[in-house]
UniProtKB/Swiss-Prot annotation:
Keywords tagged on the record: Acetylation, Disease variant, GTP-binding, Intellectual disability, Isopeptide bond, mRNA processing, mRNA splicing, Nucleotide-binding, Nucleus, Phosphoprotein, Spliceosome, Ubl conjugation
Residue sites binding GTP per the record: 136-143, 204-208, 258-261
Source organism: Homo sapiens
NCBIfam families in alphabetical order: small_GTP
Family: Belongs to the TRAFAC class translation factor GTPase superfamily. Classic translation factor GTPase family. EF-G/EF-2 subfamily.
SMART domains named among the record's database cross-references: EFG_C, EFG_IV
Listed name of the protein: 116 kDa U5 small nuclear ribonucleoprotein component
Length: 972
């Protein structure tokens, strides 16, 4: 290398190079190469790249260092290249596979003390089946009792020492909240005292009054109920409601007085006082049954065997008969059935004569129940709780109970549970009670069909169901929908009333709106798999005969609430089972919308699913477009919203403040006859409105009186009970807005003034207009209630063309509205009945909290044998939001309240008084409330702020009003 040509930094400093010649030379070489390439292309196109590597200059960005995605993965794989990372940091690049699971389920079938084949065989013998609903007040021990039955039949399932098993609380939300939300079916085989096995289909129901719709669904498919009552608390709010509901459903009633350990360990009552407490509970229940039932033979008594005593916590359950049998097994040579008849009431044992007498032999003598049942029970509990080390082993040996040293070292509760379990054995007393006093499906079928089936009981189908015939035509009544573990699909749960349902069988599903005249609400489906449900696991079966409960796959799509499943062909006369009639009303209303409007379809799908899942839930769309959910209370709607957000739609949902539904009513008779003409001016209807007699609306809603009765029977009812004249009573056209609606339409026209034949021809149209009008009142589009509408005159066109439904129906609706507005309209609001349990020193605080919310106390009284008081009160539903939290704050958590819808009451003030000014963010005085409620409800629904009179009054009617100088508060 010549150093003179470069400087110290290596830069070239020599003479200029002859670059032009070099470029010409390079160009000639390139041209020659191109010609050679062309020749090679002609000879062999494929070998071009290999033989002659290109000498062209390739830019850095055009160089290919790696194979393309298409070369690596193939042309079938789509590859997406993004220039910018738009994924938020909170979202993983590769999302984990999420498995949605909302229920606690067993992974495999657990071991049972009986073979599954034996259970399946018992299903074919309907006389050995009992369909039972366990119901009772909140926390009175229903679920814990079922846990005892599960432990008895499933040797590997045991409750942990520190917490209850709660086997039927299968939802995670139920476990977290510590309260039952859904009714859960359990099917187990249980032996009676003689060792005979029976198949028990048991429905464990929630105790909270908000979820009484779940109880209704369970009662519909049961033949009897076992009513659970806490021995310390006695008959509570929901206990009374459930007694009434069971009697209305015509079910056999038995009672289990649970938690008797509380009398001993918590209240520390002497044995005699404990007996008085138990007898008081039995007497109270009998008093309620006699109040609601017409059957004088329906009496509950331990002597009859339809009352049992239990403590689920310590595995105690006995009837007088089963306790007497313990004596017979221990001492022998005792007729335990005769002995049991002498263990209740004012009967004493004389040890000298060894006979039972009705008179106490000495002043210190105890009643037989105290001496032979309570005192031994007290001694066992006292020994275990008090003196474990010294005298307990000897006492247990005398009772024939042998425990190991490890078992004797257990803590008090598990030790007490173990001792009682060994002493009392299995729950045979409970089985005896159910077998003797709750009918089998075969015996209970006829009254069940008469009460629930809308078709004829005398038809072939009715007789097959009454006989519980497994070979008859298929009839299955589903009352509940249970979602799958992931919340995607639903399975229908119901009872087979006749025939046998098979897996894979085509069936016809009849909805609640199906009639023989209108068959639109029906669909042919194919049954998927069939299961027998045992809470946390399901036993798959191929067929289920009449008398049994069944969980059905594949028929959920057309079912909304309840359904009737029958055969697709050859069963055309089949009618439906009537929809569930709930003992409460959904009056709390919330509006919902998705945070992201594009997710509205997901929310609508979620709303459809929660509507299936909750029996009494109502979802609807207002005219303003908002989606509204109606429920029975705050806890109920909280559970609904949890399921809607987490289970069924998985989206963020906004919820409006809760409000209540209102009703519209009148307090006077219409001030003048109101009339309306049809648009073609060929027909004219005249009506007036007046209030219904007190109690009549409730009778119609409770089906004490039915519009389907013949005119003579209907007339006699109104004449005798409500003092109507016979002509008016026999002229009732309809109830509204439906067959059990609290309004009446009466034809009060005279044959001398009106052509009855012509009027009869438009009767259906007038009734439709009346029902439409009473469904959406003029004040704020709410239900009209407690109003009697009288047709006073009618001019009807001779030609059928001029008196069609399109003319008559809207006119009838308009005249209903005008008559209503002329009769001093008022708003009605729902009132809750509240029951509060609190210590005596908290009673005054309860009064204070209620008074601040327009509530008032009706009764406060001590609970017998307990340090607590029961306060009964009424509170407006609209002022009840947050009441429970407020109450607990004021009583340091010592007061516990439950509230349930009770009645409708008129809101103070005139809703149409325009002189009232509603001031924002200020509580209104009582006389202004009706106006405030009406205006705010109308705004929420997207209606104009005031009632517009021109919509409801014809021009001739307005002229008539002007003539009579009627002052109206309404804007024109």
């Amino acid at each position: 290398m010549d150093t003179d040509l470069y400087d110290e930094f290596g830069n070239y400093i020599g003479p200029e190079l002859d670059s032009d010649e070099d470029d010409d030379e390079l160009g000639r070489e390139t041209k020659d190469l191109d010609e050679m390439d062309d020749d090679d292309d002609d000879d062999d196109v494929g070998d071009h790249d290999d033989d002659h590597p290109g000498m062209e200059v390739v830019l850095h960005e055009d160089k290919k260092y790696y194979p393309t995605a298409e070369e690596v993965y193939g042309p079938e794989v789509e590859t997406i290249v993004q220039e910018e990372d738009t994924q938020p940091l909170t979202e993983p690049i590769i999302k984990p596979v999420k498995t949605k699971k909302f229920t606690l389920m067993e992974q495999t079938l657990p071991v049972t003390v009986y073979e599954m084949d034996f259970l399946a065989d018992l299903m074919d013998n309907s006389e050995l089946i009992r369909n039972v609903t366990l119901c009772g007040h909140l926390h009175h021990g229903k679920t814990c009792f079922v846990d005892c039955l599960i432990e008895q039949t499933h040797p590997e399932i045991r409750k942990r020492y520190d917490q209850d098993l709660c086997y039927t609380d299968i939802l995670f939300t139920e476990q977290e909240r510590g309260v039952g939300i859904k009714s859960t079916p359990v099917t187990v085989v249980l032996p009676d005292t003689k060792g005979k096995s029976y198949l028990f289909n048991i429905m464990d129901t929630p105790g909270h009054v908000n979820f009484s719709d779940e109880v209704t669904a369970g009662l519909r498919i049961s033949d009897g109920v076992v009513l659970f009552i806490d021995a310390a608390e006695g008959v509570m709010l929901n206990t009374e409601r459930l007694i009434k509901h069971a009697v209305q459903e015509r079910l056999a009633v038995t009672v289990c007085i649970n938690k008797i350990d509380r009398l001993i360990l918590e209240l520390k009552l002497p044995p005699t006082d404990a007996y008085y407490k138990l007898r008081h509970i039995v007497d109270e229940v009998n008093g309620l049954i006699s109040m609601y039932s017409t059957d004088e033979n329906l009496i509950l008594s331990p002597l009859l065997g339809n009352v049992c005593f239990s403590s689920s916590q310590y595995s105690i359950c006995f009837t007088l008969g089963s306790f007497a049998k313990i004596y017979a097994d221990t001492f022998g040579d005792i007729n335990y059935q005769e002995f049991a008849k002498r263990l209740w009431g004012d009967i004493y044992f004389n040890p000298k004569t060894r006979k039972f007498t009705k008179k106490a032999p000495t002043s210190s003598s105890q009643r037989s129940f105290v001496e032979f049942i309570l005192e031994p029970l007290y001694k066992i509990l006292a020994q275990v709780v008090g003196d474990v080390d010294t005298s307990l082993p000897r006492t247990l040996d005398e009772l024939g109970i042998h425990l190991t040293k490890e078992e004797l070292k257990l803590n008090i509760r598990p030790l007490l549970r173990l001792v009682c379990k060994k002493f009392f054995g299995e729950f045979t007393g409970f089985v005896d009670m159910c077998v003797q006093h709750i009918p089998s499906p075969k015996v209970g079928a006829k009254p069940k069909i008469e009460h629930t089936y809308t078709g004829g009981v005398d038809s072939d189908l009715g007789e097959a169901m009454s006989d519980c015939d497994p070979d008859g035509p298929l009839m299955c009544h589903t009352t509940k929908m249970y979602s799958t573990d992931d919340g995607v699909q639903f399975h229908a749960f119901g009872r087979v009333l006749s025939g046998t349902i098979h897996a894979g069988q085509p069936v016809k599903v009849l909805g609640e709106n199906y009639t023989l005249e209108d068959e639109e609400d029906s669909q042919i489906c194919t049954v998927g798999r069939l299961w027998i449900s045992v809470a946390r696991y399901h036993i798959e079966v191929n067929r289920v005969p009449a008398g049994n409960w069944v969980l059905i796959e594949g028929v959920d799509q057309p079912i909304v609430k309840t359904a009737t499943i029958t055969e697709p062909r050859g069963n055309e006369e089949a009618q439906i089972f009537r929809p569930l009639k709930f003992n409460t009303t959904s009056v709390i209303k919330i509006a919902v919308e998705p945070v992201n409007p594009s997710e509205l379809p997901k929310m609508l799908d979620g709303l459809r699913k929660v509507n299936k899942s909750y029996p009494s839930l109502t979802t609807k769309v207002e005219e303003s477009g908002e989606h509204v959910i109606l429920g029975t209370g705050e806890l109920y709607l909280d559970c609904v919203m949890h399921d809607l957000r987490k289970m069924y739609s998985e989206i963020d949902i906004k919820v409006a403040d809760p409000v209540v539904t209102f009703c519209e009513t009148v307090v006077e008779t219409s001030s003048l006859k109101c009339f309306a003409e049809t648009p073609n001016k060929k027909n004219k209807i005249t009506m007036i409105a007046e209030p219904l007699e007190k109690g009549l609306a409730e009778d119609i809603e409770n089906e004490v009186v039915q519009i389907t009765w013949n005119r003579k029977k209907l007339g006699e009812f109104f004449q005798t009970k409500y003092d109507w004249d016979l002509l008016a009573a026999r002229s009732i056209w309809a109830f509204g807005p439906d067959a059990t609606g609290p309004n009446i339409l009466v034809d009060d026209t005279l044959p001398s003034e009106v052509d009855k034949a012509l009027l009869g021809s438009v009767k259906d149209s007038i009734v439709q207009g009346f029902q439409w009008g009473t469904r959406e009142g003029p004040l704020c589009d709410e239900l009209i209630r407690n109003v009697k509408f009288k047709i006073l005159d009618a001019v009807v066109a001779q030609e059928p063309l001029h008196r069609g439904g399109g003319q008559i129906i809207p006119t009838a609706r308009r005249v209903v509205y005008s008559a209503f507005l002329m009769a001093t309209p008022r708003l009605m609001e729902p009132y809750y009945f509240v029951e509060v349990q609190a210590p005596a020193d908290c009673v005054s605080a309860v009064y204070t909290v209620l008074a601040r919310r327009r509530g008032h106390v009706t009764q406060d009284a001590p609970i017998p044998g307990s340090p607590l008081y029961t306060i009964k009160a009424f509170i407006p539903a609209i002022d009840s939001f947050g009441f429970e939290t407020d109450l607990r704050t004021h009583t340091q958590g010592q007061a516990f309240s439950l509230s349930v819808f009770h009645h409708w009451q008129i809101v103070p003030g005139d809703p149409l008084d325009k002189s009232i000014v509603i001031r924002p963010l200020e509580p209104q005085p009582a006389p202004h409330l009706a106006r405030e409620f009406m205006i705010k409800t109308r705004r929420r629904k997207g209606l104009s702020e005031d009632v517009s009179i021109s919509k409801f009054f014809d021009d001739p009617m307005l002229l008539e009003l002007a003539k009579q100088d009627v002052v109206l508060n309404y804007p024109m």
